[in-house]
Swiss-Prot record:
MF (Gene Ontology): pyruvate transmembrane transporter activity
Name used for this protein in its record: Probable mitochondrial pyruvate carrier 2
Species this protein is from: Caenorhabditis elegans
Function: May mediate the uptake of pyruvate into mitochondria.
Keywords: Membrane, Mitochondrion, Mitochondrion inner membrane, Transmembrane, Transmembrane helix, Transport
Gene Ontology CC: one annotated term: mitochondrial inner membrane
Pfam families (alphabetical): MPC
Topology within the bilayer: Multi-pass membrane protein
Organism lineage string: Eukaryota, Metazoa, Ecdysozoa, Nematoda, Chromadorea
């Protein structure tokens, strides 16, 4: 058994001993849920929220500096995984919600890119000139 596994088990035991007793009655079932905070099904989406933060931060960037491919990938994977999270067992609404917002941030950026390119028909020429200078 690796040291990371021992650390994880020790943290779960400490949580069961110190956190679980002080939880309100409505939160206790969530603590031991199959997608609760003692599983990767909780922590993976929690960490994935940073993608939404990055997408929101990109709203401050000029649309001509956004990547069409990156935002297409965020939109597509967000859509696919949102659906998948609703058909797996256990159904993971938390993971589904984070993927839904990944899809939304990707879509918002794709709309910004499309709007920029529509408003600036010579965008491709400008891009080529900037890369050669």
């Amino acid at each position: 058994m690796g040291p990371h596994r021992l650390l994880y088990q020790a943290l779960c035991k400490a949580g069961d001993k110190f956190v679980y007793p002080v939880l309100p009655a409505f939160a206790k079932p969530a603590w031991n849920h199959a997608a609760g905070p003692k599983t990767v099904f909780f922590w993976a989406p929690t960490i994935k929220w940073t993608l939404i933060g990055a997408g929101l931060a990109d709203l401050a960037r000029p649309a001509d500096k956004l990547s069409l491919y990156q935002n297409s990938a965020l939109f597509a994977t967000g859509a696919i995984w949102t659906r998948y999270c609703l058909v797996i067992t256990p159904i993971n609404y938390y993971l589904s919600s984070v993927n839904f917002f990944v899809m939304c941030t990707g879509l918002a950026q794709l709309c910004r890119i499309a709007h920029y390119r529509y408003q600036n028909p010579d965008w491709e020429t400008k891009e080529i000139m900037e890369t050669h200078n």
